[in-house]
Amino acid sequence: MIMCSRGHWRPAEDEKLKDLVEQYGPHNWNAIALKLPGRSGKSCRLRWFNQLDPRINRNPFTEEEEERLLAAHRIHGNRWSIIARLFPGRTDNAVKNHWHVIMARRTRQTSKPRLLPSTTSSSSLMASEQIMMSSGGYNHNYSSDDRKKIFPADFINFPYKFSHINHLHFLKEFFTGKIALNHKANQSKKPMEFYNFLQVNTDSNKSEIIDQDSGQSKRSDSDTKHESHVPFFDFLSVGNSAS
């Protein structure tokens, strides 16, 4: 029983195999294996026809050979030894490996058009988002109309109108309810009213209020005086004198 070595072929073994094939011819592989300890006849034959045979065509496959290879595979399937006979100088492994190369190439070619639409759509989506963000029209949850209803222009620009005053004082009055803000959506178009906490023209307002109060007091005094001048008739005294 011949023990077979499962390792790679060494250069010294390749040279000895070439000498034996030249001596015995590429036929009697069992006799050749006896001269190579650890190698079987099948191993010697495969090593010769796949690697060492000088008739092996090591040039790249041509387009004509590729078409013939695909046609032969449609007929014979994965019978690579039969297919290799149709290609002089090509080994079983050569035709098998190149068929897989052709299939991988076709897979890449067919998959490229499928990736283009998604890439284009993603790039166009990113471009549109950048345009919307640059123009100020981009929002996550609200449309432009809803944003106007919820945040009127006066409310958004409100802090900037009074940026020269004490912000702490402003916030205190804002949260204590001294500043009235209208958040109703149906009244968003109406102008918002604020108390004039800057104390502008407060004296004139006070004077108007005092004048109004004084006018009312004068009218009440005149009414009381008018009532005091009404003549009083003593009907009881008239009755007593008649009796």
Curated annotation (Swiss-Prot):
Known function: Transcription factor that regulates secondary cell wall (SCW) biosynthesis, especially in interfascicular and xylary fibers.
Basic and acidic residues composition bias: residue spans: 216-227
The protein's name: Transcription factor MYB54
Residues covered by the HTH myb-type domain: 1-52, 53-107
Cited InterPro entries: Homeodomain-like_sf, Myb_dom, MYB_TF, SANT/Myb
GO biological process: cell wall organization; regulation of secondary cell wall biogenesis
Chief localization: nucleus
Start and end residues of each stretch annotated as Disordered: 206-227
Any one Pfam family match given in the protein's UniProt record, by short name: Myb_DNA-bind_6
Gene3D superfamilies in UniProt: Homeodomain-like
Tissues in which the UniProt entry reports expression: In elongating stem internodes, expressed in developing protoxylem and elongating interfascicular fiber cells. In non-elongating internodes, expressed in developing metaxylem cells and interfascicular fibers. In roots, expressed in developing secondary xylem.
Additional information: Plants silencing MYB54 exhibit secondary cell wall (SCW) defects including severe reduction in SCW thickening in both interfascicular fibers and xylary fibers of inflorescence stems.
Species annotation: Arabidopsis thaliana
Domain of life of the source: Eukaryota
CC terms in the record's Gene Ontology section: nucleus
